[in-house]
Amino acid sequence: MAERVAESEKITINLGHVDLGHIDLMVQEGFYSNRTDFIRTAIRNQLERHADAAKQAIARKRVELGLRHFSREDLEEVRATGQMLHIRVLGLASIAGDVTPELACATIGSIAVLGALHASSAVKAALLDRIR
């Protein structure tokens, strides 16, 4: 069965009563369909506003953008070459469920993810000192 990858991550934010009231007013007046629509739009607008700075940082830090999946086969190939991966992802990095903690430790030197890392609890625990 194929592994299901979530298309989004749930976050929780705390807002002051006045800010929340303003959001509710915008929703009530029909500018947005709901609070989530307002918050997503605000986030997208801020990301667009800072897009040039983000592009420069991505290039400078040599970060992969988007979804990057590491299969057991990928890591076995890396192990065969004697190399170590230094994973840098902005988005979602996922390590297949059939990757053992031993294989992960033998092939992954470091992980820096701006976004989310999906891996088994055992693999995350084994790599804990390598996750930045």
Where are these regions (language model features)?
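Short Lys/Arg-rich basic patches
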Residues: M1-V18, V27, T36
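Detector for repetitive beta-architecture
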Residues: R62, L67, H86, L92, ...
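Short, T/G/N/S-enriched strand-turn elements that build extracellular solenoid repeat scaffolds
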Residues: I58, D74-L85, G97-G109, A125-I131
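Short, basic amphipathic alpha-helical segments that act as recognition/interaction helices
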Residues: A2-R4, G21-H22, S33-A57
